[in-house]
Structure formats: C-alpha cells, structure tokens
Amino acid sequence: MKKVLFSPINFAVVAGLMSLVGLTACTENSQQPTSQPNTAQTSAPTEVAKAPLKELTIAFATRRDTKDLQSKVDQVSAILSKEIGIPVKAVIGDETASVEALKADRANVAFLSGRAALKADTLAGSKMYLAEVRDDYSGGKTYDSIFVVPENSPLKTLADGTQTLEQLRGKRMAFTSRSSGSGFIFPVSELVGLKFVDGPDRLEQFFGKVTYGDGYSSALQAVLRDQADVAAVSEYALLPPWITAEEGKKLRVLHAVPNVPAHGIVIDDNVPADMREKLINAFLKLNEPENSELFRSLYNSTKLVKVDHEPHLAIMRTAIERAGLKP
C-alpha cells in the first residue's frame, strides 16, 4: 500500500501556512521603507550652515592707556579687511556695550577682558580665540593682581599669603572698582579662599573701611593721599599713565595674586568657521614687524597668541564663583 504524502487536507494546511508566511514577509518588507523616513524626519541636523557674512563689525574697548583710538582701530580694520576679503567696521565702546552688541548681533568680534568674555559666552555664545601678551604682564598672557601699600608702610610681606593678608584686618581698603578683575574679583577671591571673608558683602567685617574707585588711578591715589592703607590693582597700574614714575617709587607690592587671564579677541558664534579661521590668521598678521608698532599703540600689547576659551578663562570663572559674584 502506497503512503500518501499529501492528502487534500494536508496540502490545504501547508498551502495556508506558506501563504501566511509570505504575507508576513511582504508586510514586513512593505513597512520598512515607511519607518525610515519617520526616523529621518525626527533627527535634528548636527550643524546649521551659517550664511556668509558681507561685513564684519569689531568692537574695540576703550582704555585709558590708548590715545587717538578711533584712528588706530580704523587702520587695524583696513589691515583685517584686506586679509579676509570683506569690509571690516570698527566701533569703540565700553565692555558692557560690546557684550550687548555681540548679543544683539550688532558686532561680530570684540576685544574684552576675561570677565566680559565669560559674560559674552553666556549671553551670545561668543568665545575667546586670541589673547594679548604685554611686556608688563609677568605671566605673558596672564598678569598679577596686587595689593599695594606705601613704601614706608609698617605692613610687611611675610612667609605666606595668610600671614601677610592677616595684617590687613581693620585697615582701610581701596578697590579699583566693583567690576575690575584684578582690582576686585581676584583680591576678594583670595580673601575668601584664605577664610578672611565670606564674600563681597562681608568685606566690612574684615576691613576697617572699604572704598571703590573708578579705575586704577583713583585706587592708587587713595593710598598716595593717605586715604587708604592698601589698594588692589593690576601689576601694570604701577606704571604711567596710571600714575607717574615718581609716584610709583612711593609704593610697593605687599602681596600678589597671579594668573589673571589677559584680555583678548572674542568672536561670536554667528561667524562661520571658515571666516573665523581667516579672521584669526588676519589678527595674527598684526604681530608682523610692519604692523607691530600700530598694534602696540592700541593697548600696549606686544603680540597676540592663540588660546582655548575654557582653559584660558577657567581661573577667572573660579575666582568669580569663589568671590560669590556673577560674570
């Protein structure tokens, strides 16, 4: 007797199963293409192309040690424009106005201090790419914040900062201003770090009297006129034009706080990467012999050097936080 491999019923069952498998496969194959576009639609682009700039605006900071600034920045702008291939417009203003201009896209580049650069980063996404180097900066691209006393002051520089600054308890203190990095932020950070004060609102609990000037000169003049026992300024403020050479001989450094980050060139994030590189290289042209005298006449800088935003400004950020302040 022959065995029947496929009865009508068995064949029908098998055929049905095969049809079901085929239907499932077809269904899966037909679904895959529709799922891919959905994924593509929900994925955000990693980088948005920036429109080419037709003109650059650079905000140059006002400084007391610079004369005829507009004429000089116009010459610098002409050099930069030639290098990058588009017009460069120069404007002059204080740091607050410069940061606001970056935020409002009225400026693409600014020359700022460390604290202002951090604020520009927060408000506008701008970063520092170049820092100045000066002969009167002891650290090259960093400088010292200093506590200054009269040459004949009984206050002495002792074995360490704690012993030295302990002598200031009850004394009359003159800060450069409430916004100065070297003349307020770093000195207060040092005092907080050494546990003499809890923050900027507790200074009167340590000092006998606290005053704030409108710049380095006014703070130093308070000491020279015996209106204060000590002043906090930048190390380069002991030189003209802040005070005369003769006045400088009547003062001395009691204590120094190092590594205040140098001022530098901040570029906004609305500048495309290729233009940013062109601009950085154009600024570095100011270091060359034919441009160095003009560049030095701006802010007494000897050259510009490349920096990484975060490492260069990290100590400023720490000082601000420790002093209980905001950028």
PLM feature spans:
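A conserved helix-loop-strand patch within extracytoplasmic ligand-binding domains
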Residues: 133-184, 189-194
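Ligand-binding cleft/hinge of the Venus flytrap
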Residues: 75-84, 182-212, 242-246, 319-322
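Short helix-initiation/N-cap motifs at beta->coil->alpha
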Residues: 90-103, 115, 198-221, 259
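Periplasmic-binding protein-like
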Residues: 57, 61-62, 130-146, 204, ...
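Short, polar/charged alpha-helical segment
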Residues: 42-45, 50-51, 55-58, 65-87, ...
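A ligand-binding cleft/hinge motif common to bilobed small-molecule-binding domains
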Residues: 114-125, 187-193, 221-249
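C-terminal motif of bacterial Sec signal peptides marking the signal peptidase cleavage site
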Residues: 22-25
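Bacterial signal peptide processing site
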Residues: 27-30
